[in-house]
Amino acid sequence: MSHLILNPGTLTLSQIREISRGKVSLELADSAINDINTSAGLVQQVLDEGRTVYGINTGFGLLANTKIAADDLQLLQRSIVLSHAAGTGQYMQDATVRLMMVLKINSLSRGFSGIRLEVINFLIALVNAEVYPCVPEKGSVGASGDLAPLAHMCLPLLGEGEMSYKGQILSAKEGLEIAGLKPIELAAKEGLALLNGTQASTALALEGLFNAEDLFAASSVIGAMSVEAAMGSRSPFDSRIHAARGQKGQIDSAALFRLLLGDESEISLSHVDCERVQDPYSLRCQPQVLGACLTQIRHAAEVLGTEANGVTDNPLVFQDTGDIISGGNFHAEPVAMAADNLAIALAELGSIAERRIALLIDPNLSMLPPFLVENGGVNSGFMIAQVTAAALASENKTYAHPASVDSLPTSANQEDHVSMATFAARRLRDMTENTRGVLAIELLASAQGLDFRAPLQPSVVVAKAKAEIRELVTYYDKDRFFGPDIEAATDLLITASFNAYLPDGILPSL
């Protein structure tokens, strides 16, 4: 478990990756406490002066013009949490909820939200106790923030809802006892500050970002394996070609392939004078395709890194003037578009990988045995594995349709344009699984192709990558139950071990 002293608004992508992948012990920096207390004091000042301010002593949404009596303000906070906890579907994974909570703590602690330190410390205590609220994954349209998911996240503060602890689903009462906590009463504005924000969609999108980074690394390494297995040329990776175009992602991708393939190998030297003039695009244009994906990954990382440190509830409290201003930072359009870009990148990583599998099993293109198996006819080899890859790649094409272009008005047309960011981000998990499956099959196919090239050896790095999969899956000498092989290759990709083949600075969070 890592220990993080949180200076609000300064989370790095590498820190966020660590939080999303493992448990964290969280401590709020002392320097944040004054801003939190000052902000909460300004909310209390509004009440003391009898002023009417949206979100403090009014209704919400279409009911914003309804003033709430002072005696009903605590009931209002409880009511908004209970009424907005209307999500459906399976519960999010604990890791997602943990990241969502840390992002919410990070935002609230910047001192723009008018929330008391007691409430923030309650959330920190839950994170540190590893007792997480149960949050259904469906029910948010990404404006006015992720209302339903965040309401479910906040139910335990009131002693309501369910919680997850070490794989067990508990009542809020049981979960709070484990954490050594008791329910609290929310003060004016606190319910809205907790529920308003983009932390659910941002957490899901960040998970998608980190998975996309891992799969970019895997796609590069496995793509290099396929170049060697198919006796592809190194010429398309020449730095002069990519410098002439000037696309940064492409230039970096080509440099990575040169690193993975080296200047030459026994395999490459064996076909220097072959009659094939050009390779198919799935080999030759990898820097162009993967480089474009890398550009999208980097752009999404910039957007999501900013959002993770932003303040996205409403209204906001400005300490320098005492102003409390209503705006629209809860609208998750930046998150939705970033997630859409990641979806396109994931789809393309899988799409070009499937084409390389098809190339390897086709003897006319790869000059390898049909379907990568001896005694073809009796053995079908990789025939249906390629069909599986095609099915996964095709499914991703549907998933990649932009979610951010859709909008349905809500709250009696008060909230008349929404982002659909939560679905945009949530579908990235399914797309990750599909792309990972395609790459797992290509990993098996390229290793099989390299075995057929023996005794000729590939580049040092490619040989090392091949050895990783051969520790788990043996040479395919005849037909056998294929499912476990794909599962083993998939499990290897889940470990993200291929990230180690990339130099520093290629991927934003590594």
Swiss-Prot record:
The modification 2,3-didehydroalanine (Ser) is found at residue 144. One of its GO terms (cellular component) is cytoplasm. It comes from the Bacteria. Contains an active site 4-methylidene-imidazol-5-one (MIO), which is formed autocatalytically by cyclization and dehydration of residues Ala-Ser-Gly. One of its GO terms (biological process) is L-histidine catabolic process to glutamate and formamide. It holds the Pfam family Lyase_aromatic. Transmembrane segments: none annotated. It is found in: Cytoplasm. It catalyses: L-histidine = trans-urocanate + NH4(+). Coiled coil: none annotated. PROSITE patterns: PAL_HISTIDASE (PS00488). Its main location: cytoplasm. There is a cross-link at residues 143-145 (5-imidazolinone (Ala-Gly)). Pathway: Amino-acid degradation; L-histidine degradation into L-glutamate; N-formimidoyl-L-glutamate from L-histidine: step 1/3. Belongs to the PAL/histidase family. This is Histidine ammonia-lyase. It comes from Shewanella sediminis (strain HAW-EB3). The gene is hutH.
